[in-house]
Amino acid sequence: MTASLVEDTNNNHESVRRIQLDVAGMLCAACASRVETKLNKIPGVRASVNFATRVATIDAVDVAVDELRQVIEQAGYRATAHAESAVEEIDPDADYARNLLRRLIVAALLFVPLADLSTMFAIVPTNRFPGWGYLLTALAAPIVTWAAWPFHRVALRNARYRAASMETLISAGILAATGWSLSTIFVDKEPRQTHGIWQAILHSDSIYFEVAAGVTVFVLAGRFFEARAKSKAGSALRALAARGAKNVEVLLPNGAELTIPAGELKKQQHFLVRPGETITADGVVIDGTATIDMSAITGEARPVHASPASTVVGGTTVLDGRLVIEATAVGGDTQFAAMVRLVEDAQVQKARVQHLADRIAAVFVPMVFVIAGLAGASWLLAGASPDRAFSVVLGVLVIACPCTLGLATPTAMMVASGRGAQLGIFIKGYRALETINAIDTVVFDKTGTLTLGQLSVSTVTSTGGWCSGEVLALASAVEAASEHSVATAIVAAYADPRPVADFVAFAGCGVSGVVAEHHVKIGKPSWVTRNAPCDVVLESARREGESRGETVVFVSVDGVACGAVAIADTVKDSAADAISALCSRGLHTILLTGDNQAAARAVAAQVGIDTVIADMLPEAKVDVIQRLRDQGHTVAMVGDGINDGPALACADLGLAMGRGTDVAIGAADLILVRDSLGVVPVALDLARATMRTIRINMIWAFGYNVAAIPIASSGLLNPLIAGAAMAFSSFFVVSNSLRLSNFGLSQTSD
């Protein structure tokens, strides 16, 4: 298996490879931070290591994959090529959880009698019998050795490379408590005389077997629930990836059918899909009709009808009917694979607050050893007994836990990404999510966003001796060379376009060309008539069409305006409810479009938008967004077309409708694959909920460590309680993140 690579090029024309490696053996945030630091020391390497997903994402220039693996292995970990999600079926978190559960069960069963006997023999020495020390040692040995081996193994590996991690703290605490207990049991001491139960407790022998075993049990329990929760958090993504077909039936030229692995399907090959089967690749229907379940892509259970010439998406399921499809995109080039990559890439990125947490975790473990040593020395200097000072040191070592810092952001993002994918919302990264709470203005494009984008010619008006059919024929001939949605509607209205020469497209204005020796222009009325007066009949047709919310283009032949073509679109049923939902959240909505003022206002009135900014060229849309930001507004932009790309990139939060152009999708921060606009407020709510969860996690993580270590240093925490608190801390963070998996369950799907 080769490493997962993505080629790119920087400004110096040097080849940049994106390499993803799975890193095994990382059990805490300090582990991930150390691997990241080691990788970033390599010249030409920029690396990010995600503790939650155990994936190192590396942008490298002139660096071999083997060199990267060697550096990771020298840091004490194992590196393998990242398994592509589309074929990944193994859940490492579930396997790790099962391993921990076996150790936890054995440790818990032995811990109960060990804790009871250890406490009794320490407080009431008269109850001791011959061989009592060997009994305690026999009960403790499996716990502090085999059950705690995952911690000891990592600690030994760290020591080999002169490093330290959370496991170093745990292992040191367990071994120290065990060693001190063995010394107390097997080294002769002066008998003590105590009177009363409290004196017996306060002056009991320092037998810390129950602490060593208890810390092992609590930490194993915490790690088990953490691993199980992380497995559940990633289940949505694994379920998404598992929807891909494993095999495909290819139609051979002689009509025979051949079953091959899905990965071997090539573009332009014809393949067969039967009821209940998953479509293997993106393609065009050649033969047959069927109903398709698009929920894998859109999150909506609404079936879609497919017939010859229909486009279909890989990863969706045929409910009934039989289809023969010509593959247009296969493997990693399909829309389904791209969506899975979006979810993965979102988990690779780090929020600003997580970068701070990583820097703290990197120096945290050495600091804990220093603090523990200073705390123990202070107690000794204050006249405390060695037993008391050791108890304080042990408490500090056990309670310190940088794991919460490392889990706070990645687990929340993992759950949110998976849940978002189920809802048809794909989060591309943290950049915009960090400003989501400040969003106060939502800007909408019109065509394809608020409307269906399925344009059709409603009326054709002619003048100057031209008939409507001739005007439409000339317009269709020129527009046949254009890809604009208006052009598509005009061409569809006249099925037999004539040949065109000297075609030229004028961005934001219109097109021109030569048809049958006539110079024909089609476009905005103001552009077509800028050098010639407009006929009263055409102007009347324009006003009437725009009053209905239609787009009207003028046609001129040899410099004389001779026709007006009205293009109708349908407002989405979900638009009004979506705008109402946004307004109820206190957000201001704006319609920003390149269409004319009258048509834009007609649509805005239907959906409930008060502010309309029309007749905007693509670059002018960017200026509008920037002006809003300069006025202190935090802006979200919703769009789908090529002309929306710059505005989406300029906005604080860009939301692209998933059926939009690659330019729009590439510039956006959130991708909404449903046609329904009802997903817009849901997407904003999910983003807000994600950032709220991250903030709660970070407050807990920082607050826990800031408060716990001083309390332990002051001697107010028993080491056993400290171990339980440390395990609960990580469990709380992961469980809090898991609440996002229920997001939207109470909301009505559009």
Swiss-Prot record:
CDD domains for the chain: HMA, P-type_ATPase_Cu-like
Keyword line: ATP-binding, Cell membrane, Magnesium, Membrane, Metal-binding, Nucleotide-binding, Phosphoprotein, Translocase, Transmembrane, Transmembrane helix
Domain HMA, residue spans: 17-80
One GO term of the biological process aspect: copper ion homeostasis
Xref: Pfam families: E1-E2_ATPase (PF00122), HMA (PF00403), Hydrolase (PF00702)
UniProt-annotated catalytic positions: 445
NCBIfam families, alphabetized: ATPase-IB1_Cu, ATPase-IB_hvy, ATPase_P-type
Family: Belongs to the cation transport ATPase (P-type) (TC 3.A.3) family. Type IB subfamily.
Name by which UniProt lists this protein: Cation-transporting P-type ATPase B
